[in-house]
């Protein structure tokens, strides 16, 4: 998707399906219709108030709404990589743009565009790590304290945590 937040109004795959070497074109809605499951969260986190994560489904491709630039909405399967790339260019997606928040501070302000209905205020979880009393004591006894605001957009606290899907087709044995 070229949009940060948008409803998918339609996806026309007909031109792509008729291109040389194309085996198929799948959309996020087809995955839902075929009851293909969602990607899972590898590490569920409890918020500091004890509640669980307020996270909805995480599909491999967006079925109805895109929530970040670059979110997949369709995939082309073809005999060669170049054929797949050419056919992908022929997929036509009609979007209805929705309001988006471009940074974390804007996303959590009252009245900000809501991205996930399961996460009020755009907060999936709110957590802390470490010992609050020991940290407070260290600051109180420090000779100098420096304050710095740092923004980590879409932070994943892992060295590598790809959200991906892969498929391999094997012809049935006869």
Model-derived regions, located:
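Conserved beta-alpha junction segments in alpha/beta enzyme cores
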Residues: 134-174
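Short, charged beta->alpha transition segments
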Residues: 54-64, 132-134, 153, 163
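Charged, often Cys/His-bearing segments associated with DNA-binding zinc-finger transcription factors
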Residues: 125-133
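Flexible, low-hydrophobicity surface segments
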Residues: 1-126, 145-148
């Amino acid at each position: 998707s070229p949009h940060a937040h948008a409803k998918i109004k339609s996806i026309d795959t007909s031109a792509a399906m008729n291109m040389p070497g194309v085996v198929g074109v799948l959309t996020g809605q087809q995955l839902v219709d075929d009851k293909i499951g969602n990607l899972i969260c590898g590490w569920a986190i409890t918020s500091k108030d004890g509640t669980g994560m307020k996270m909805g489904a995480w599909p491999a491709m967006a079925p109805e709404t895109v929530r970040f630039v670059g979110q997949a909405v369709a995939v082309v399967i073809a005999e060669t990589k170049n054929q797949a790339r050419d056919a992908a260019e022929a997929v036509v997606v009609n979007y209805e743009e929705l309001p988006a928040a471009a940074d974390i501070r804007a996303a959590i302000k009252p009245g900000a565009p809501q991205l996930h209905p399961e996460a009020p205020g755009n907060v999936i979880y709110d957590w802390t790590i470490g010992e609050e009393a020991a940290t407070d004591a260290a600051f109180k006894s420090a000779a100098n304290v420096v304050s710095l605001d740092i923004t980590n957009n879409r932070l994943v606290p892992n060295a590598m945590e790809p959200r991906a899907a892969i498929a391999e087709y094997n012809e049935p044995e006869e």
